[in-house]
Amino acid sequence: MSNEDTYKRLVVVTGMSGAGKSVAIQCLEDLGYFCVDNLPPILLPKFIELMNNNTESLSRVAIGIDLRGKDFFNSLQEEIQNIINLNEVLVQVLFVEASDHILVSRYKETRRTHPLQDNISLIDAIQEERKLLADLRGVATHIIDSSESKPKALRSKVIEIFGSGKDNIFTINVMSFGFKHGLPIDADIVFDVRFLPNPYYIEEMRKLTGLDPLVYDYVMKWKETEMFYQKLIDLLKFVIPGYMREGKSQVVIAIGCTGGQHRSVALSERISNELKDFFDFELHTRHRDALIEGTINEKA
């Protein structure tokens, strides 16, 4: 295959225990990779066969391998070379490491036991692991030193290496709900719009929802609605990039009115449309309680 883009992609994530392999795996998952952690190296050929037999869902795969599977670990480098020689899958090896004193500090902070720490000190276990991984580090296509990195900085490095401009690595979820049915427990930001005029008290609108033009126009015609909306949308445009910089893969914005049928639905629709035009992110809109009150709508 001459075009690199036609290859299926396999990223092998390995490196020092405690250096941040789990963070790297989670980030790759957010980038759209199918991720498997702690796969025994002996199973790599079977997994490659599975990738080749699956056209879509396994086109980009990340596999985490470390010394927890030490009985099989010695064969890892050989298995990787065999896969490269097959020329069927584009193989990249990400090696995550950190300095000895940083790893010691992290283990003490988390109170976890190093996988090689059998009757030896923590620092001896770390140094032994570094020796065992030396050859594998030598064949790595990418090496990240996380010694001076917080998790969000490590995520940024992984995105820089494996992401692309077309990868939707951040998702905006806009949800309408009714306070009488309870707060959405997964919301990051909640706004209360019960102070706006309520279409429920107008007979011809009572059984409609904010998706209906009659209700939508009624909610939007008020001066206080427009003032609130402009302030709200400016705030969201300011804070959403901050959520991404902090390493979050998504943000859930919840707009609530009394029943989740009229005002919150109309505002959620307008907010979704503007954010979708403003940001180059994946966006989903869901009206949680409109089914309870009347109708429901969910869209991407």
Curated annotation (Swiss-Prot):
Annotated family: Belongs to the RapZ-like family.
Name under which the protein is recorded: Nucleotide-binding protein MCCL_0516
Pfam family, one: PapZ_C
Keyword Membrane attached: no
UniProt keyword Ribonucleoprotein, yes or no: no
Positions contributing to ATP binding: G15, M16, S17, G18, A19, G20, K21, S22
GO molecular function, one term: GTP binding
Native organism taxonomy: Bacteria, Bacillati, Bacillota, Bacilli, Bacillales
Record keywords: ATP-binding, GTP-binding, Nucleotide-binding
Purpose of the protein: Displays ATPase and GTPase activities.
SUPFAM superfamilies the UniProt entry points to: P-loop containing nucleoside triphosphate hydrolases
InterPro entries, per database record: P-loop_NTPase, RapZ-like, RapZ-like_N, RapZ_C
Binding site residues for GTP: D66, L67, R68, G69
